[in-house]
């Protein structure tokens, strides 16, 4: 089942965060994920939110996500993300495909 990592970011040190961004795709391309959203001007439709960036990435399953997120390559560059931005990141499961439903039902 597909999973999605949704990150809300508050970038407070653009230079440090920029080092992370500059290396991100070189690491990410080696894994099974897709970047679906990377928006530095999200529009709040309801509620209050003071973040200044939203990122959504998808993976075919949780194991693939963890292969990337827990890789030494990613952990090295993530230090710049953590130093340059405050983040809230959630991992959510997608809706099962018809094939996945048929296998379980």
Annotate each PLM feature:
Residues 1-54, 60-70, 93-105:
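Short S/T/G/P-rich N-terminal loop/turn motif that feeds into the first structured element of a domain
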Residues 53-55, 87-88:
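Generic beta-strand structural signal
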Residues 66, 74-92:
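C-terminal structural segments of small proteins and small subunits
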């Amino acid at each position: 089942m597909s999973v999605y990592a949704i990150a809300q970011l508050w970038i407070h040190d653009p230079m440090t965060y920029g080092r992370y961004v500059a290396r991100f795709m070189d690491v990410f391309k080696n894994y099974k994920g897709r970047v679906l959203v990377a928006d530095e001007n999200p529009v709040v439709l309801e509620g209050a939110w003071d973040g200044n960036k939203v990122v959504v990435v998808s993976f075919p399953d949780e194991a693939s996500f963890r292969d990337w997120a827990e890789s030494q390559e990613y952990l090295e560059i993530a230090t710049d993300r953590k130093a340059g931005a405050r983040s809230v990141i959630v991992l959510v499961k997608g809706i099962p495909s018809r094939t996945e439903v048929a296998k379980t039902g």
